[in-house]
Structures are given as structure tokens and as C-alpha cells.
């Protein structure tokens, strides 16, 4: 599910468990990662909320999150960043991020 920077910041500030894939439409690895990330998000039955966000459409929040390259996946819990992964990830690695956030 696509999210805006403003909505993402609201969810982080509320202390929700959030994982966001930050991507750009011109990025080749992002195009490969997006369906993998969405598959994990669609099968996710935990309290973790998963979103995608276009960094070019949300430059201010991307900058505030320290995004320097895409794709980047960031996870948050209790208003704080928990993990950051840069580059193309496998489905199992994304599942590990979800599990770490649930059990962490």
C-alpha cells in the first residue's frame, strides 16, 4: 500500500510497528523489489503495517529519514527506527524484518 510522507510520519509518531519500502520509479532494483515486498505485505498477518513510498514524491520525509539510495527498507517501532536495509532483498529477508519487529 502506497503512503505519503505525512501519513508515514503520523504512523511513526503514534508508535506503530511500520515497515516502509522507499523507492523511485526510475530505479531498476526497485521495480524488482516492489512485487516481492507487496507479496510479503499481502500475506502479513501480524500487527506490522507495511507500506511503499516514492522518494521523489516525498523528498522532505525521505531526506529526514536519511535516504541516500534506493531501494531502502526501514522499520520503525515505538516512534524509533529499528532497522534499515539498502538494496535488493529476498523475500525471506523481508519476512525476517517483519519477524524481528514482531518479536523485538
Question: What are these language model-derived features?
Answer:
Residues 1-17:
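A short beta-strand-turn-helix
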Residues 2-4, 22, 34-41, 45-60:
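Thiol-based oxidoreductase modules, predominantly thioredoxin-like and allied folds used
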Residues 9, 58-61, 92:
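Short loop/turn elements that flank and shape the SAM/SAH-binding pocket of Class I
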Residues 16, 23-26, 69:
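Short pre-active-site segment immediately N-terminal to redox-active cysteine/selenocysteine motifs
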Residues 21-23, 75:
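Structural cue for short, hydrophobic secondary-structure segments
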Residues 27-30, 73:
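The canonical Cys-X-X-Cys-His
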Residues 59, 65-74:
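Structural micro-motif
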Residues 75-104:
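Non-catalytic, surface beta->alpha helical segment in thiol-disulfide oxidoreductase systems
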Amino acid at each position: 500500500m502506497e503512503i505519503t510522507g505525512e501519513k508515514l510520519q503520523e504512523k511513526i509518531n503514534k508508535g506503530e510497528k511500520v515497515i516502509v519500502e522507499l523507492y523511485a520509479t526510475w530505479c531498476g532494483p526497485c521495480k524488482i523489489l516492489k512485487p516481492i515486498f507487496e507479496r510479503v505485505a499481502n500475506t502479513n498477518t501480524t500487527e506490522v503495517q507495511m507500506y511503499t513510498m516514492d522518494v521523489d514524491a516525498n523528498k522532505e520525509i525521505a531526506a529526514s529519514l536519511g535516504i541516500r539510495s534506493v531501494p531502502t527498507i526501514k522499520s520503525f517501532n515505538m516512534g524509533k527506527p529499528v532497522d534499515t536495509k539498502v538494496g535488493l532483498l529476498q523475500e525471506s529477508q523481508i519476512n525476517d524484518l517483519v519477524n524481528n519487529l514482531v518479536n523485538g
